[in-house]
Amino acid sequence: MSVTTLNGQPTLNISGPGQTALSRLDPLKKVFTKFFSSIPQKVRGHVVAVIGELIGTTAFLFIAFSAAEVALASANDNKGDKVSYETKSISTTQILFIAFGAGISLVVNAWTFFRISGGLFDPAVSIALFFVGAIDLTRCVLLCIAQCLGAIAASAMAYGLYHGGLHTATTLKPGMSPAQGVIVEMILTCQLCFTVLMLAAEKHEATFLAPLGIGLSVFIGELAGVFWTGGSMNPARSLGPAVVTLSFPSYHWIYWVGPIAGAGLASIIYKLIKALEYETAQLSEGEMHAHPVEDSEKASGHTGPCECMCFKVAAQGQSSAASTLQVATTDARKSSSLVPTKSTKSGNSEVKKTETVVEEPAKTQPKPAPAADDGFFGEMYAD
């Protein structure tokens, strides 16, 4: 094990007899690096995003489907170790369990893949990001394909691992029309996509917490929609079980039209509040006039403290040598700051002492800094 310096930063090299599992994977890393180095940078970026969304969507939906299977299953003593899913109506406890499983699964996986592909896992979210210009059309199409494939893979895994079949298909509640289902899915997906746009696409100090807010958005969306439409909010989530079970209801289209319409509605709302400069909405009119510099900073996305040049110079002046500022001030204010000179004799030569006096500002307490500093910065603040 050794430490080297790369671009001024210390780098840990693992080698020698004390190699770890990470170091033993280096040959595999070299193979991948050699393979992907031949791919253009833009194409490589698409490949990374597609792989991230494929794996992330599979992991997210597999956990969500598994939680739903647990919630829907009920033990049946008369059938031995068999599991019965026959219930008259889904209970609120089951809905809560399903919603929590989907929400917490999204939090964990989105946080994991956030820096790889964005952790979208939903074609509707990808389309919303395309509508606002966050991603281009090529990336959007590739992500949607990867997300659909991931949903099919997750459904196949759940179908093959859990006996009793797959019971996570999204269906309308009896008596609910497709038109009502479209509206429900549109509203719930709009809320989810708007959360993504404000917490992830809109950069701010809490962007790193975006997966938590997005997961909570899925949680409340499932609470509101599972009973009525299955709580899809995700075309891929509805496509996966339908493909694996080869069961496409006649109203399957609502799980595409509703979420895509919701993505468009969320994009319109986002564009509207951006055009209205929502950053300044919390400031009163008096604050807008009293703090024009702070307002402009907030409008440009800078929320840090004001760092005017005069304050920077003042901070530097307090820490620099007082003699430098004294010379500059003396040259600039000779007519008002010089008093008659006093002469002293040293042998046959005469030495003149010059004392500088700076006029104190009226009604101002004396400052501990040198007098020359007060005069210099006094003129700057006066301007």
Curated annotation (Swiss-Prot):
Record's keyword terms, sorted: Membrane, Repeat, Transmembrane, Transmembrane helix, Transport
Renumbered ranges of motif NPA 2: 234-236
Motif NPA 1 boundaries: 122-124
Extracellular side: 68-93, 137-140, 202-207, 274-383
Ranges of Polar residues composition bias in the record: 332-349
Lineage: Eukaryota, Fungi, Dikarya, Ascomycota, Pezizomycotina
Subcellular location: Membrane
Main location: membrane
Transmembrane segments: 47-67, 94-114, 116-136, 141-161, 181-201, 208-228, 253-273
Disulfide bonds: none
One cellular component term from this protein's GO annotations in UniProt: plasma membrane
Name under which the protein is recorded: Aquaporin-5
Observed effect of gene inactivation: Leads to a slight reduction in the vegetative growth rate and delayed conidiation.
Biased composition (Basic and acidic residues): 350-362
